Amino acid sequence: VLRAAALFAKLTILILKVATMRVNWKTYNSGKFYDEIISSPGYARKPARGLASYLRSLTHGELLEKKTAADLAIKTMGISFTVYSDAGNIDREWPFDIIPRIIAEKEWDKTSLGLQQRLRAINCFINDIYNEQKIFKDKVVPSELILDSGNFRKECMGIKPRFGVWAHICGSDLIKDGNGDFFVLEDNLRVPSGVSYMLENRRVAKRVFPELFEDAYNIRPITEYPAQLFDTLAAISPRKNKYPEVVVLTPGIYNSAYFEHSFLAQRMGAELVEGSDLVVENDKVYMKTIDGLSQVDVIYRRIDDEFIDPSVFNKDSVLGVSGLFNAWVKGNVALANAPGAGVADDKVIYTYIPKIIKYYLDEDPILPNVESFLCVDKKQCQHVLENLNKLVVKPANESGGYGMLIGPQASKKELEEFARRIKADPRNYMAQPLISLSTVPILGDRVVEPRHVDLRPFVLQADKSYVTPGGLTRVAMVKGSYIVNSSQGGGSKDTWIVSDD
């Protein structure tokens, strides 16, 4: 009994000690990695000094109380995502770390210009390959790479959407290297997701740190995104009515991103529909309502190409609408993103984006790509096979971090299996060196610790462009991990664009 009492007393003292501890930036150590908050032990980078000082003023117990408040807010607000598994679909509460990421506004302004430049060039490229194909004739990009892409849609040949824009919504994944410079890791053009979580992260952060939003920082707002998205969609409406009928087409409640579909429809004031809610008559799309059929002008579709129209693509699809593709071809309805836009989502095509920017815009890329190796090229493929244990290998058309190999963390068996896959289908693989991703602090159980992050800003394009101030910061919650995807254990943070001063 005495021993148990003594143990309990020691545990109580330890808990009280941890609870009253404060963040000690002198002992915070990101090792060889570039940390975005702390430049050297005890010293915060200029834009983050206010945040670092504020966190230092709180005890660890007070920080944990704020974390509990954030968790409760997420639960109350119903912010969730779905994970698919063999055991069934599991709804999970959104993983959120309360310590925000800080980016200086001058740095972000340059990054924003780079993202707009990139999407302009990508849209020129998509419009060209489905029409004149000048880039093939000028031998800038090999035609066989495009025509062999799993996302190339021959059915889209000869089509020219309004403004020549195919990808109206893009989510590009950015990383910072060991020098703190942004690089584009990949472009998501098919059905980019995550923007609702960016918006909800901000709502939660305001609840947790209201005093920082009121006094300390001039943080750029992000709340205008739904309005900007609606304006982008309205701009591509075939009919010039003052209030175009915009709908969000969802696969349904069992889709992993259904929360986002519902969220965006509600915030835009648009109808959330499934394929069964729509019908095509005389090459026009109508929505079924209690008052009869209502013509639809714009469909923000959150369904992959192959499922949007069973009469053209996957004949077994029950998610889309028969006749929808032809209605789009005839110009009677706009689709965002347009069918076929995903051809530029191909990770093999990604390697050509710098050349694509130079070709169509006659500009040097503002944002660089990560060095990449194409397995379809024999010489580069040999390099990849000889250095598999040092590289990250990605399949051309997977997303969410699935199907990839992180060489330095792979077993001998995994390396051998990937070598076999690459040799069997070299067109389907590309490789990149393992970048020393930057770190930011997260709130651990006992101390503040560094973790790796990436960033997904969202870019809109129609008659004009828009970039979210910041984006969805994804963080690897496990020490040493590079996996930031929420479906694989990653978390998220609010992203603050703040003054450099």
Residue ranges: model-predicted function:
Residues V1-D501:
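Preference for protein termini
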